[in-house]
Amino acid sequence: MRLLIGSDDSGCIKELVANRGTNTSEQSALQPLHLEAHLERGLNAKAHQMLQISDNECLLARMSGDIELVSWSREPRGGEEDKPVFEVSSFQVMATLGGLLDGEKMQELHKRSQRRAASADRFVALFALPGQPQRYFAATMSGQFHFLALADGDLKLQKTFSVRGPVEFAQLYDLEETEKLVFAYGGEDNLIKLVEVSRDLEQLEQIWEAKNVKNDRLDLKVPIWPAALRFLQPAVSPASEGLNYQFIAVTRHSHLHFYQTTHGRKPFRSVDLLPNREPTTSLEVVGDVTPLGNVKSTSFEGFSIITTDTKKSILQFEPSGHLLGKFGGSDIKGFPSYIHVQGKYLVEGGLDRYVRVFELKNRNMLLKVFAGGKVSSVLLLDVSDVELPLSKKEKNKRRHKRVLDEDQEREEDNELWAQLDGSSKRRKSKPRLDG
């Protein structure tokens, strides 16, 4: 496997090459073939978001407010006696676009925040715009929606819109082609909103806003803090005419909300995921999904979700709230701040400074490597394993087996010839009967 790891350790990215079964916490297990730091920028420029845009390019969104276009080339390594052959990468920043964060706005937003310490502005989303080659979108916690273009090897800022912050997530609807780009966003004390952006990037318009759920049993207002959202396909038999969007959202208060815009502005169903209201911070879907993780279904069934709490748990639920299982179990020792479903795998990293890869179908851990610093983001570039040369013990074992196989084959041949020879002699000695 080949991974790029965004690490808080000196604000670098690290290239990891390792096979399934690698575990740096066990001396007897396989160890990484390659782990090397690149593009160090310091702790204040750690990579919050990473996006692969081609076979040898990615975008890095850094805490410094820069988005970098990074290219890499590879050359072989190894090949000595009993050493595996694999490729390692050299990285180069090809273009940089800066000044995309707004620290002053975050100071204003902190005045109405429940957080004890002020949060620095950061990137909360970075993805490619479907159907628009070399066009990208980045969202910030302060409420900046940036639209970027890659042209002639350079990054250009096409347009920036300001929305209400703080923004914990920004999700694009990509289940079908729409006349305008449709985004959902929300955050602390910031109800979920749907906005449309014209394809020419001239206008952003809010088209829908959620309402909070009813007060709790003590008639107290339920805190507003949506943390992540995924769209579904439009309802087949909508309750009313008009705007037809469906989505699910998790909140920092461990609720899973179900929305249909034709049903109203409040969630039509709400599920408590965790009994003690531990904060849930992320949302990934396991099932038939789009490149941006939206659900290719009109039904709120037939898929599962993965979320994290702020302690150490990665939990998989049915939409009903039934717990299917946990990833990592007691192996994870700190907040799993980053998770991402990619194909058949779940990639995880966080405060305990390990990066892990799990198999979705059984939640088995395939890889665990100490990254040296808190893991902020991960790209899984390749899932194939490097062919390892045989050890002397394995070579001797195979040689011994080959000798045994040859002896057995020779013995079987001798037995077969003996049987054939015996049959021939019996036919010759058998008296002929004249009619």
Curated annotation (Swiss-Prot):
- Composition bias of kind Acidic residues appears in 406-415
- Compartment(s) where it occurs, according to its Swiss-Prot or TrEMBL record: Nucleus, Nucleolus
Give one GO biological process term. rRNA processing
Q: Which GO terms describe its cellular component?
A: nucleolus; preribosome, large subunit precursor
The primary site where this protein sits is: nucleus
Return the Basic residues bias intervals.
Answer: 425-435
Which residue ranges are recorded for the region named Disordered? 394-435
Source organism superkingdom: Eukaryota
Q: Which UniProt keywords apply?
A: Nucleus, Ribosome biogenesis, rRNA processing
Quaternary structure and partners: Component of the pre-66S ribosomal particle.
* Functional description taken from the UniProt entry: Involved in the biogenesis of the 60S ribosomal subunit.
Describe the family membership recorded for this protein in Swiss-Prot or TrEMBL.
Belongs to the NSA1 family.
Q: What is this protein called?
A: Ribosome biogenesis protein NSA1
Organism lineage string:
Eukaryota, Fungi, Dikarya, Ascomycota, Saccharomycotina
By which gene is this protein encoded?
Answer: NSA1
